[in-house]
Amino acid sequence: MPPHGRLSHPALKVLRVFLTAFTENVRSEIAGADIMKSAGISSGTLYPILLRLERAGVLASRWEKETPQDLGRPRRRLYRITPAGAAIAHEALNDLASPSTLAPNEA
């Protein structure tokens, strides 16, 4: 995983979605389509980010257990943030929000 300072803005938006869902106890697993809506990014941007974050151990995923016939739609891949990923996300987002990282006219 690159240092959090090298995380792209869209990757930080994705991590923020997970932290928000986790801290609000809304749900522990989130489908890609829901992440897209919450983060406001396209599927072409989202899925490569999810793959990189999963390979780095920041996220984990699984397929829904139900079959497409049971669901009446294709199965979804569900993503969750790992404990290590939560620590990385908190640190990256806190650093991003700290006054020392803001431009002089933003402080």
Task: Give the residues covered by each predicted segment.
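Amphipathic alpha-helical dimerization/coiled-coil segments
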Residues: 1-3, 84-107
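Beta-hairpin "wing" of winged helix-turn-helix
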Residues: 56-72, 80
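N-terminal helix-turn-helix DNA-binding core of bacterial DNA-binding proteins
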Residues: 5-45
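Residue-level signal for threonine
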Residues: 8, 82-84
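Short, hydrophobic-biased segments on the C-terminal half of alpha helices
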Residues: 47-54
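Short aromatic/hydrophobic contact patches that present stacked aromatics
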Residues: 38, 78-80
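Exposed loop/turn and edge beta-strand positions of beta-sandwich/beta-sheet ligand-binding modules
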Residues: 75
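Alpha-helical residues within the helix-turn-helix
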Residues: 37, 54-55
